Design a protein with these regions (language model features):
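N-terminal beta1-alpha1-beta2 module of alpha/beta enzyme domains
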Residues: 1-79
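Acidic (Asp/Glu)-rich catalytic clusters
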Residues: 24-25, 73-82, 104, 108-115
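Glycine-rich, flexible loop/turn motifs
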Residues: 60-66, 79, 85, 124-127, ...
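Conserved strand-turn element in the central/C-terminal portion of the radical SAM core barrel
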Residues: 86-94
Length: 139
């Protein structure tokens, strides 16, 4: 069985180098980091949860504070040799496709082929639009 770690890393959470080294030592297969460049204060869709359900009103603080997954996974690649490094997920409609292709190829190169490119389209309309995407046409 392959077991990985998924977490929101922030400036107040564990350092990714320390986490990656320990994860590899303990036999974890992969480290997955999410992407949220910006979470607007006012959102038409507070969450993918049903309105009124627990957690639907406000997102946890780490959603607002999460680090860039590509830079952070690059750091993790420098202190590990076997741990696979993954985006869980990269919000493709919010990115320039040429720059994204370069970032993905670079991370795969510096990690010696250990990068897993997890992709998605996002759930927050305002975030997508702030980042230059079209929410209705994101798929």
């Amino acid at each position: 069985m392959k077991i990985g770690i998924y977490c929101f890393l922030t400036d107040y959470s564990i350092d990714v180098a320390k986490l990656a080294v320990e994860a590899e030592k303990l036999g974890f297969e992969s480290l997955w980091l999410p992407e949220h460049p910006v979470i607007p204060k006012f959102r038409t869709m507070q969450s993918y949860l049903k309105p009124g359900s627990e957690g639907a009103e406000e997102l946890p603080k780490q959603y607002f504070d999460t680090v860039d997954p590509f830079v952070t996974l690059g750091k993790a690649s420098c202190v590990t040799t076997k741990l696979k490094l993954a985006t869980g997920i990269c919000l493709v409609p919010e990115r320039n496709p040429l720059l994204l292709a370069k970032e993905v190829a670079t991370l795969d190169l510096i990690s010696n082929g250990r990068f897993i490119f997890g992709i998605g389209a996002g759930w927050c309309k305002e975030e997508t639009e702030i980042m230059g995407g079209n929410f209705e046409r994101r798929w």
